[in-house]
Amino acid sequence: MNTLVLKIDAILSKHLKKQLAPYTISSQNTYVAFAAKKNGVTVLLYKSGKLVLQGNGANALAQELNLPVAKTVFEASNNSQDIPIIGSDEVGNGSYFGGIAVVASFVDPKDHSFLKKLGVDDSKKLSDKTIQQIAPLLEKQIPHQSLLLSPKKYNELVGKSKPYNAISIKVALHNQAIFLLLQKGIQPKQIVIDAFTSQSNYEKHLKKEKNHFPNPLTFQEKAESHYLAVAVSSIIARNLFLDNLDQLGQDLGYQLPSGAGSASDKVASQLLAAYGMSSLEYSAKLHFANTHKAQALLTK
């Protein structure tokens, strides 16, 4: 997906709005003055005068609209690594046991040599042992913001008749991690989130969050394979999740598995038999189907 970021004046802004009037869409971002979507390309005009075009046809649409395409900034590939980037990723949302770890990291081009020497890559391709070795080095060298939502807090916030669902809670965590990192004086040229929902859905849930920032976002599937900043966040988040999972297991006297398969059902049923539902409230995400499966195992 291509992302173009331009700075346009009031005259060009007025002309742009007129051209794209038939393609207007709503945006929940309070910093966006005008939004449209044409030919699969999302167009966001910010109150600051910054214009963002996102989509595979961004360059073609920019030419059609007579925009200054010479100011093209980014393309979601390794060619975009020559700019300072914040990348955000989460780990744990698909695991029954353990919390959710979200990390936003700032990677400058000067960090690339260090990261390549460490072998930083998509954390999903790395063993847990390697991640646990690399993560402390990244935490020391790379500016980042880590957030961990414990299972207990997750269960208070997520579920039927509760403030969040499984998607909106991740929106809140990503937004807060990036916001706090920006508060440290970080000045990225691009902010990339490993896409877990559509941009429109993200912005819908973002509306109810207290903290906001004006920087445009790039949503990229499997972003950890395209951006070093996201790969760094993925590694740090994975390590944070594993540490939390291990600590929860030590507290309960059980080895808690990652994931949401039959192994989780079995351990959950053992916890229910030993300690009751309070043990799962403390260590697991209750709305997962594993809870009912574990209860069913007790009756056999």
From Swiss-Prot:
Cofactor: Mn(2+); Mg(2+)
Entry EC no(s): 3.1.26.4
Gene3D superfamilies with a match to the protein in the record: Ribonuclease H-like superfamily/Ribonuclease H (3.30.420.10), TATA-Binding Protein (3.30.310.10)
Protein residues bound to a divalent metal cation: 89-90, 194
InterPro entries in the cross-refs: RNase_HII/HIII (IPR001352), RNase_HII/HIII_dom (IPR024567), RNase_HIII (IPR004641), RNase_HIII_N (IPR024568), RNaseH-like_sf (IPR012337), RNaseH_sf (IPR036397), TBP_dom_sf (IPR012295)
Reaction catalyzed: Endonucleolytic cleavage to 5'-phosphomonoester
Segments passing through the bilayer: none
Cofactor binding note from Swiss-Prot or TrEMBL: Manganese or magnesium. Binds 1 divalent metal ion per monomer in the absence of substrate. May bind a second metal ion after substrate binding.
UniProt entry tagged with the keyword Lipoprotein: no
Molecular functions (GO terms): magnesium ion binding; RNA binding; RNA-DNA hybrid ribonuclease activity
Cellular component annotations (GO), alphabetically ordered: cytoplasm; ribonuclease H2 complex
Gene Ontology biological process: DNA replication, removal of RNA primer; mismatch repair
RNase H type-2 domain boundaries: 83-300
Compartments it resides in: Cytoplasm
Keyword Protein transport on entry: no
Keyword set, alphabetical order: Cytoplasm, Endonuclease, Hydrolase, Magnesium, Metal-binding, Nuclease
Chief localization: cytoplasm
Job description of the protein: Endonuclease that specifically degrades the RNA of RNA-DNA hybrids.
Family: Belongs to the RNase HII family. RnhC subfamily.
The protein, known as: Ribonuclease HIII
Native source organism of the sequence: Streptococcus pyogenes serotype M1
